[in-house]
Amino acid sequence: PIWWARLAATPLLGHIFCALIIPNLGPLISRANIDQNFLPGAAPDHYYEQSAVGLAFRPGAFRASAQDVCALSAELAAQAPNYPEILAPAIIITAEKDRVLSPKRHARALAAALPAAELVIAPDCGHMPHQLRPDLALAAIRRVNAMAGVSAQS
């Protein structure tokens, strides 16, 4: 995990960091972090305000998120052997240029493990393909519904 997650998840020092530093520093650097998530594209207009990013900098919320980040790799490794048991149709959308999560390690591996999965790669998108290419997300929802025999009227 990245340094801030390890620090925030630390028992005593993490509480201090989350209570004193994050509420003040987080909002100052979050816009740049959001922009990084959308690269090579740009964040939609008003994304910061409309997505309520500021709520993530509440001490308890930030610490819980950091603990999740620290546990993620181990949790995914524990779940992965069960992926072939998931028989429901799935469409996995990943971004070609995601700098946050490795498309190869996450989306491609999951698609390969699920028996009824389809992988959709959003070209020239960063970590937020559902924001930049909502057409892909909507098409995926429609395809999964069709695969599952659910009508558009349901």
Please annotate each region the language model reported.
Residues P115-S154:
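Catalytic active-site module of serine/aspartate enzymes centered on a nucleophile-bearing elbow/loop
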Residues Q79-A80, A88, P103-A112:
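Short alpha-helix in the alpha/beta-hydrolase fold that links the catalytic acid
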Residues P1-A19:
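Flexible "cap/lid" loop of the alpha/beta hydrolase fold
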Residues A71-S73, E96-L101, H127:
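Acidic catalytic loop of the alpha/beta-hydrolase fold
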Residues G60, L101, R105, L132:
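Residue-level signal for the nucleotide or nucleotide-sugar donor/cofactor binding architecture
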Residues I34, A66, I93-T94, I121:
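Short beta-strand segments
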Residues I86, I92-T94, D98:
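Short beta-strand/loop motif that positions the catalytic acidic residue
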